[in-house]
Regions:
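N-terminal glycine-rich phosphate-binding loop and ensuing alpha1 helix
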Residues: 1-63, 110
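A short, conserved beta-strand element in the Rossmann-like catalytic core
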Residues: 6, 120-122
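Well-ordered alpha-helical segments embedded in enzymatic catalytic cores
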Residues: 26-30, 99-103, 128
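Residue-level signal for inorganic ion chemistry
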Residues: 27, 104, 118, 148
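Short phosphate-binding loop-to-helix
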Residues: 63-111
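Short beta-strand-to-loop acidic/aromatic patch adjacent to the donor-nucleotide binding site
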Residues: 109-120
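Conserved core of the sugar-phosphate nucleotidyltransferase
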Residues: 123-157
Length: 157
């Protein structure tokens, strides 16, 4: 998911901020780890207004890498118009994870994992989730990667 508006970030598109000298962003690492774990489809859930920048910073590069590895790439757009029912007056922000998954409903046709574009989870998480998703489970079975809070916070919280 990369449709957040980054209102606390302080400028630019948070999901597209470089984290190293080579211009990689957190999603580069996440996608690499997911593919290595066995995931074979990447769906970017973004806002329509960042599509051009998104494709320039990461989309085109990831599409090329995925094409070499036989991994499918899709795009969908999170929008306030995708909300069933009516919006509270003045609402300007997307509704978060649930609404993001709803925006991707046409591209999801089996078990899937959802990540935030600006969080790094680590290689083992993708392997654990992929292994779980490849097992037989009842239709109403779900999983979540859990973390020990003190191991996830910086000195600044």
């Amino acid at each position: 998911m990369a449709a957040g508006i980054g209102s606390r970030f302080g400028g630019g598109i948070k999901q597209l901020a470089s984290v190293d000298d080579s211009g990689h962003i957190i999603m580069d690492y996440s996608i690499h780890d997911a593919i290595a774990a066995g995931f074979n489809k990447i769906v970017f859930i973004i806002r329509k207004d960042i599509e051009k920048d998104f494709r320039e910073v990461i989309g085109n590069r990831i599409e090329a890498v995925c094409a070499q590895k036989g991994v499918e790439v899709g795009y969908c757009f999170q929008s306030l118009t995708d909300i069933p029912g009516s919006l509270p007056e003045g609402r300007t922000k997307p509704w978060g994870t649930g609404q993001a998954v709803l925006a991707a409903k046409e591209l999801i046709d089996g078990p899937f994992a959802v990540i935030n574009a600006d969080d790094y989870y680590g290689k083992s998480v993708y392997t654990s989730i992929h292994d779980y998703l490849c097992q037989d489970h009842p239709d109403n079975a779900f999983c979540m990667a859990g973390f020990i809070l003190k191991n996830t916070l910086s000195k600044n919280g």
